[in-house]
Amino acid sequence: YIPENLKATLKGSREEAEQLAGQIRDLVCSTFGHTLVLFTSYTLMGNVQQLLRDQIPFPMVQVWRNSQEEIARFKKMENAVLFAAGSCWEGVDFPGDMVSSLIIVKLPFAVPDPIHEAQREQYRSLESYIQNVVVPDMQKKLRQGFGRAIRTEQDTCVVSILDHRAAKKGKYRGDVLDALPKCQMAEKIDEVEDFIRSR
């Protein structure tokens, strides 16, 4: 599910957090909890969770860094919503129907650091570096995130991407679709609700 009505918002703005909170609330209510929400920023995760505190009728668990305790608590709860970042993109599995909705809040592009800067200097142009390094890194991490909820052909899960860059006219839509297995696509929340009801 990649919503058709995603607007580009200023990174770190209240508008960004409010738009995401609204999308997440609608998805969580459609799937009656059972949701893993993956963030690329702890700050954004905290801001969105604050906005949702009184809007979601299901228990919410937030993982800061790699808290095995919180993950174990989520796994024991019914209908819970887990907000996570960092290491939860890989290495933590939620098999079967434990997670019926996986929400990827932003495309997982690497944060620039001295290593990436050194790599960047090996390419003639920024565009070449983005296509050869940045995009493949994002695709790999996106597949890892996708794999948190869908491990086998028997697993079913709504996977939502709430980044406008993956939407219909978004800059990275083709790269996102190339990274993931072929799936039934949806752009409206009603289609998600129909899919959940049909399971």
PLM feature spans:
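ASCE RecA-like P-loop NTPase motor cores
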Residues: 1-199
